[in-house]
Every structure is written in C-alpha cells, then in structure tokens.
A protein has these predicted regions:
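Surface-exposed, charge/polar-rich loops and edge strands
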Residues: 1-425
Length: 425
C-alpha cells in the first residue's frame, strides 16, 4: 500500500527573499562546480547553498554538509524559511519552451512513506553508486531536511485524480515564477480536507515509479533506519513530485554513449561484435548533420532495434539495425532496450563487467560528434529516446535498466518546498 501524505512544507518567505526566480536551482546532480559557484556568488538565498552540487568539496567534503546545516538553521531562525502550520499537498505547473513549442508539466508534491524496494510500492529503474548515496545521506543527517523533491511517475488510467487537480488549478496560484530561461511556474497549496483526503485515497493502490532521484531515495531509506521511532515520524517520509505517465509535458530524451582511451585492438573487437549483431548502412554527416541522424534513429527505432555510430572521424557515421534473424526476445525483457543490448552483448564482451564505467554519457549528440573530431572520443553510440510504455513495462516487471538509459525532462527545480525530517507528518 502506498502512503502518500500531505506534509508540513517549509518554504521561502517572500517578504524577505522577494523574487522566487532567484531562489530556484536545478537538481544537485545537474549542477557542476562552475554553476554552483555562480549561483552562490550572485544569489545569496539560492537553494544551491543548501542542496549543494553533484560533487562536494574534494579537499574537505564534510565542510559542505556543515555549512549547509548551519545556514539552514540560520534561515529558519531568521524567518527566511517558514514552515506551514498545517500539512498540505502542493501542485506545481511547470511551463517551458522546447523545440520552438510550449509545454507544461504537472507535479504533485507530498510525502511518500519510505519502504524497501521489495515491498513493490516504489519501483526503481536503475542501480545506484555508493559514493553518491553516501553524499545524500550525510546531507540528510547534517540538516535533518530534504531540500528537493524526487521525481516519480504514476498512472491515472481512469482519470480520477485529473479533475481534482484541475479544480485546484482553477484557483489563483499562491506563487507565480518567471525564471531566466523562459520557464513559467505556477504553484498552489492544496489545503482543503476534501481534496487532501481524495488524493491520499487515490494513491493507496498505485505503484510509484522512480524517475529521477534514486540516490536520494536510498539515502532516505538509510536515514529512516537510523532515526525513525514512530510510523508518523517525518523521517519515514520522503518528498516526491508525482507526475502522471501521460502528462503532455513529460519527456524521455535519449542518453547517448561515448568511448575514449581504449586500444585499437579493443576498438576493432567492438566493431566485430557490432557486425555480428547489426546490419550497417552509412550516413554522411557532412550532408545531413548529426541532428538529422538522431531524428532518423528515433523514427526507425519505433519498430526495431536501432543504434547510430559516430567515428572514428567526425564525418563518419552509420545506422545499425539489429539483424532480422536474431531472436532478441530470448535475452529477456531488458533486451527491448538498445542500451542493454549494446552494454551486455557488445561492450561487456570486449571491456568486461566495468564497461559501463568506461563510457561517457550525454544527451548532446552534437557534443559527442565534437569530441570525436577532437579525438577525445574514439567512438560514440546514439540511441533513440526510451519509449515510455516500454519503461513502464520493464520497470513494472521488476527489472532495472542499464545506467543512464533515461533522461527525464524537464528537471524539477529545487527550492519550492523543503521537507523537514524533524517532528511528524
């Protein structure tokens, strides 16, 4: 049973911070050291001061957790942050520009009871890295707070929740935010008991699919085991932003792979394994360009296994299609993923079980081509966007995909609501 509850959200005080657009930041794992420095320097109340970036200070990693904890406590004492007296759900409508068009995504924020994966209430789709989990554990333990929502997915096939959220959006937003990258956020506090009861009841029998935030979820699991004493403890709940699978603003973008620093013999062996599995046709990048190649891969991939290959020079590319006489279904459900086929049947054969650690991952096809041109990479593989229905089928069946198989977009902003892990929900 899923226990999705309203939480006593902790929010920035607009009387002090004034402009919420200067508060929000991307998820921590999308923030490199340069962006972190810029946000900290230019925006004294930005959420990055609390959430941090993907890599803590390598010279003194504990310092970042202590600084975040101290600042968080100061902001609470100074009323920069104020906790809602009553528990609420929160609704965010995130409007953004994409490919010359406008899209909107809805995210419903609240607290999900933290449970082990074997309970099958929260379903993961990838494995985690221990250092990244430890980083988030230390932040939770230092601050006793969760600064960003975990993005997860649910299915509302009967459109039960949809009219409830539509009714909320019929009211004036509690907050409207225009950010510097042409995004528009509307934010509502859901405070009426009828809506809160209906939302809680709706999710009781709905599995929750983790989209972004596996490391944060597993950090919450460990924090719970170390600190929880009662079922209603805030430590037992992790803040999530739940997005419906068919939300028109939800996108799964492709994640590509690149390899560099391998020997000529290994590269030749990779080519041999590819030739054993795929039929190849050349693609002239000097005529059509890498974006056209990516679009063709996406189109061809609707009905078959397709991989694009870049290299060894910047104008050379191929489209690979899995040979028709290969019975890929015997490999199991994960073989629906080209990333799995590439990793398990090609790269691991050549590079061993650590093949995934040797790859560079990017959703920027042109960037990979540039790195081929500069000889930073020797070969790159372009993949199609992972189909949402295939994702739901594989993950719902208890399988986990290879690392960096999914790139959910848009990324949810950090800073709208903070979940305090002290007290009860």
């Amino acid at each position: 049973m899923v226990d999705f509850r309203p939480i006593h959200g902790c929010r920035f005080n607009l009387d002090i911070v004034e402009d919420m657009a200067r508060i929000l930041c991307p998820p921590y794992d999308m923030i490199d050291s340069n962006l972190q420095r810029d946000l900290k320097t230019l925006r004294p109340y930005n959420a990055v001061h609390l959430e941090g970036a993907e890599q803590p200070d390598p010279l003194d990693p504990e310092k970042s957790y202590l600084e975040a904890s101290s600042l968080y406590r100061n902001w609470l004492e100074q009323d920069v942050l104020k906790q809602d007296r009553e528990p609420h759900y929160y609704l965010m409508r995130y409007g953004y520009q994409f490919d010359e068009g406008r899209k909107e995504q809805l995210g419903l924020l609240g607290g999900i009871a933290v449970e082990d994966y074997d309970k099958r209430t929260v379903l993961p789709h990838e494995f985690t890295r221990e250092p990244a989990v430890q980083d988030r554990v230390k932040l939770l333990e230092s601050c006793k707070a969760q600064f960003s929502p975990i993005m997860s997915l649910y299915r509302d096939s009967s459109h039960i929740l949809e009219p409830i959220l539509a009714q909320v959006m019929g009211k004036t937003p509690d907050i409207e935010i225009e950010d510097p990258v042409q995004s528009h956020i509307c934010f509502w506090v859901i405070s009426d008991s009828e809506s809160k009861d209906a939302i809680h009841q709706f999710f009781i029998d709905k599995p929750i699919f983790l989209a972004d935030g596996h490391h944060r979820y597993e950090a919450a699991l460990r924090n719970q085991s170390n600190n929880s004493t009662s079922n209603n403890d805030a430590n037992n709940f992790v803040m999530m932003a739940l997005v419906e699978f068919d939300d028109p603003g939800l996108q799964l973008l492709p994640y590509h792979r690149g390899l560099g620093g391998i020997s000529s013999a290994e590269l030749k062996h990779i080519r041999k394994e590819l030739d054993n599995l795929f039929d190849s046709s050349p693609f002239d990048l000097s005529v059509k360009g890498v974006d056209t190649l990516a679009r063709e891969i996406a189109e061809l991939g609707k009905t078959q296994h397709v991989v694009g290959v870049l290299g060894p020079d910047s104008h050379q590319a191929e489209i690979l299609i899995l040979k028709k006489d290969i019975d890929w279904k015997k490999w199991g459900p994960l073989a629906m993923s080209e990333a799995w086929v590439l990793e398990e049947k090609v790269l691991k054969t050549v590079l061993g079980n650590d093949a995934a650690k040797q790859a560079d991952y990017s959703h920027d096809a042109q960037g990979l081509r540039d790195r081929i041109s500069s000889k930073d990479l020797q070969i790159a593989f372009l993949l199609k966007p992972f189909p949402m229905d295939t994702f739901e089928e594989i993950v719902g069946g208890g399988q986990r995909l290879p690392s960096k198989s999914t790139f959910f977009f848009p990324k949810l902003p950090t800073g709208l609501v903070i979940h305090r892990l002290e007290g009860q929900v």
